[in-house]
Structures are given as C-alpha cells and as structure tokens.
C-alpha cells in the first residue's frame, strides 16, 4: 500500500518537496496551502487527516518575511502564529492520530563560531538572547516546547533555479554583501533526505541538522558564481551595521555529521552543491 503524505505549505521549500515526492509512484502525496484550506483550524485539520488517513505530515509552512526576516519585527503576531502555534498544533494533532510529522525549520537559533553547533547543543540565539531576531526567537520557542516529530534544521537554502527565495538569487541581486561564513542547505539534497525518511518509514522524535558540510564564505560563493558567469558588477562588501536592518542576523556553522552517521545519508560538500546548482542555472 502506498504511503500517504500531506505537505502543508506550497512555498519555496514545500513546492520542491511536492514536485519530487509526487513523482514517486510508491507515494500518494497531497499538497495543501492557505489558499486551498485553513490548516490553522485544528478541528478541520483533524477531520481532514482522519478522512484521508495520512501517514506523514510535512510541515513546510511558516513565516519568513518578505523581503527578509526583518519583516518579522513588524508582523510579530503572524510570525508567532505560523512559526510557533501552528507547528505545535500540527504535532499535537499528529500525535493524537498516529501520524508522523516532519518539521522543516531553521538553524538560525545558533550564532557565533565557538564551534560547529550540533543537535545536542543548547540554542544560544533565541528565546533567552535579548539580541536575537524575533524570527529566531519564534523558531526557538517552537522547538523548546515541541515534543513530537522529526525536526530538520536548515540554513540559507539554495537551489538549482533562480527562485527569488534562493540564496544564490539573493546574492546575485544584492549590491552590498556581508563577508561571513555560514552553513547552507541545497534544497534538492534536502528533498532526497525527506523522501528517504518517508520511504524507510522513519517515525518518532528527533532533531537533525541538514546543511552541506565544509561551508563557504560569501567571497567563496561569488567566486564560484563568477566562474559560471553569474555576476553582479556592483558587488561590494560592507559592514552589517551600514545596512540599517531592523534585526540582527545569525552567523554560524552547524555540524551535520548526524545525517550520515545515524541516517546513512551522504551529503556532498557545499562547493560541490553550489557547482551543481550553478551548472543547472546557467545551462
């Protein structure tokens, strides 16, 4: 019998997840969004899941803000609703109905280069850090309370198209860049990993850092982009303070060795992933 998968959220990441999982003939996949039904209505969601008998719920919805996370400082109520209240409700409903949730969330709850942060480290850029952005605070708040599901932390996602939410697209269009090294996530790899979780029937509660290892700094990324003739002639490096952002930013490296050691999934390093993405974009 085919596994039934409900994907909630048809944005940047959710759309990618649906496209690949929907092509898997062993899966029966449904994509829902705010435009198709009110997934914030717990009673409706319960009835819907009972009726359809889903095995997995992939939480790909959330508040990120446009054009960036500064918007969370303005729309705090919406940010809290979609990053904290709704995911917690998903976990509660799934636990009651014996459905496995997979939460796609953010690793921006860490900051600093003291170490490569692992899943067992206590987040230092969230609820208990007064300098944290509200976006990071909301992500940490959810995780600090949530007690069910597989939580996948990603950072600065990029893909093999010029999607306006992709790190590559953002870097390409920005004139002013910050020189920093950060973990990043190649979305096609993430989708492969989620597909593996579903195919293998993974269940329970766990947290996984999913970022391509050996992260590049900003200069390394734009050097690769220039190699593929994807360049902005106005690029220049500036100090973060000159950008007049409403919120601080997380800068950190996440340790993603757990993906290989406990899940048997081989992640290419960041340079390989960027080359693959840029080759597809410029083909």
Kindly give the residue locations of the regions a language model identified.
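N-terminal Rossmann NAD(P)H-binding glycine-rich loop of SDR-like oxidoreductase domains
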Residues: 4-22
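Adenosine-cofactor binding site in Rossmann-like domains, unifying the SAM/SAH pocket
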Residues: 29-48
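NAD(P)H-binding glycine-rich loop region in Rossmannoid oxidoreductase-like domains
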Residues: 42-84
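Catalytic helix-loop patch of NAD(P)-dependent Rossmann-fold dehydrogenases
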Residues: 74-81, 85-86, 109-152, 156-159
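NAD(P)-dependent short-chain dehydrogenase/reductase
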Residues: 132, 143-192, 196
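Substrate-binding strand-loop-helix patch
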Residues: 160, 180-191, 210-228, 276
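Mid/C-terminal beta-alpha module of Rossmann-like enzyme folds, strongest
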Residues: 196, 200-246, 250
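Conserved C-terminal active-site "lid" loop/helix of NAD(P)H-dependent oxidoreductases
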Residues: 217-223, 237-283
């Amino acid at each position: 019998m085919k596994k039934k998968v409900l994907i909630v959220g048809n944005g940047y990441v959710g759309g990618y997840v649906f496209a690949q999982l929907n092509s898997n003939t062993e899966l029966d996949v449904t994509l829902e969004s705010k435009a198709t039904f009110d997934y914030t209505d717990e009673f409706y969601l319960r009835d819907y899941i009972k009726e359809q008998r889903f095995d997995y719920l992939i939480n790909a919805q959330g508040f990120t803000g446009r054009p960036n996370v500064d918007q969370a400082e303005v729309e705090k109520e919406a940010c809290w609703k979609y990053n904290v209240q709704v995911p917690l409700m998903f976990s509660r409903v799934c636990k009651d109905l014996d459905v496995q949730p997979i939460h796609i969330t953010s690793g921006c709850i860490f900051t600093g280069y003291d170490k490569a942060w692992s899943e067992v480290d206590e987040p230092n850029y969230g609820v208990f850090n007064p300098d944290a952005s509200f976006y990071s605070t909301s992500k940490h708040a959810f995780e600090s309370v949530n007690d069910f599901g597989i939580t996948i932390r990603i950072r600065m996602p990029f893909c093999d198209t010029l999607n306006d939410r992709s790190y590559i697209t953002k870097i390409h269009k920005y004139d002013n860049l910050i020189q920093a090294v950060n973990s990043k996530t190649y979305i096609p790899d993430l989708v492969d990993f989620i597909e593996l979780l579903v195919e293998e029937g993974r269940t329970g509660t766990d947290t996984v850092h999913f970022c391509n290892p050996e992260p590049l700094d900003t200069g390394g990324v734009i050097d690769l982009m220039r190699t593929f003739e994807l360049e902005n002639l106005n690029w220049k490096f500036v100090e973060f303070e000159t950008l007049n952002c409403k919120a601080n930013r997380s800068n950190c490296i996440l340790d993603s060795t757990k993906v290989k050691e406990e899940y048997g999934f081989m992640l290419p390093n960041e340079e390989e992933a960027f080359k693959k993405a840029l080759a597809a974009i410029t083909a």
